[in-house]
Design a protein with these regions (language model features):
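Conserved acidic residues
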Residues: 137
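Helix-capping/helix-break motifs at membrane-protein junctions
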Residues: 149-150
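A short glycine-rich, Lys/Arg-flanked "PGG" loop and its adjoining helix->strand segment in the class I
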Residues: 154-166
């Protein structure tokens, strides 16, 4: 029997966080809190943004939460509990995560070991500014690009564009520097959270939403901006950037 979307999301949060229980209280509580408190995870599924994408690249993957979320979604769909009014569940052949922090990669490898061993997922400790992105049908970058200078951001985006297959999509969440108080709050929280997770950041390199959109359009993307701060005091925006068809 299919649950209501709200009930389904709660079940999915529990299922996706469960693999982290063996990694310690912090990893498990962080997984539950992030998956339950961040609207982007449910939105990716409800809007079908990753449906049909076989090769997914998650840049700044942390401890692999997006991968665990997609695996839990696929399992739920196979059990017949998928919300009837949602697009089909994503069923990627492989999800590849790139993460700067080695301890997060260790957590991801440990928590999602069955998927790693089955070839469904892989996690690499690397700097996004120099990592090989390979080839992908979808690239996800959530809340990490503003950690590096603008020129480095532009280089990452250009390499993402080169890595995407025809018809590929980039899902990029950013803070809108023109977002007023919400933007200031999100920056303060960002500094606190990244410090707790072992990063040492003195500067965040942010742009107004219009500047992000202009940059992506200049790389050949059609861009749709979707507010992605529901239930939070932040000024976050999800940019759905689809490669334009070449003549």
């Amino acid at each position: 029997m299919t649950a209501t979307p709200a009930a389904f999301i709660q079940h999915l949060i529990t299922a996706a966080a469960e693999p982290y229980r063996a990694s310690g209280r912090y990893a498990w509580y962080f997984a539950r809190g992030k998956l339950g408190g961040d609207p982007v995870f449910a939105h990716l599924l409800a809007a079908g943004l990753l449906t049909g994408r076989q090769r997914i690249l998650d840049i700044g993957c942390g401890q692999g939460l997006l991968t665990s979320w997609l695996l839990a979604a696929q399992a739920a769909s196979s059990r017949g509990t998928w919300p009837g009014n949602w697009p089909d569940a994503p069923r990627p052949a492989h999800v590849r995560g790139i993460e700067l922090m080695a301890h997060d990669v260790v957590r991801a490898d440990s928590a999602l070991a069955p998927a790693v061993q089955a070839g469904q997922a892989s996690f690499v400790q690397a700097d996004m500014c120099s990592a090989d992105f390979g080839q992908a049908d979808a690239v996800v970058i959530l809340d990490v690009l503003h950690y590096v200078p603008i020129a480095a951001q532009d280089d990452v985006l250009a390499r993402v564009r080169q890595s995407l297959s025809p018809g590929g999509v980039l899902l990029l969440r950013v803070g809108d520097a023109a977002g007023g108080l919400g933007f200031k709050i999100s920056n303060w929280v960002d500094h606190v959270v990244t410090t707790l997770r072992g990063h040492r950041l003195s500067t965040l390199y942010c742009r107004p939403l219009a500047a992000w959109q202009d940059t992506l359009r200049g790389l050949g993307f059609d861009v749709e901006a979707q507010a992605m701060s529901q239930g939070t005091p932040f000024a976050n925006v999800l940019l759905v950037a689809r490669l334009r068809a070449t003549p």
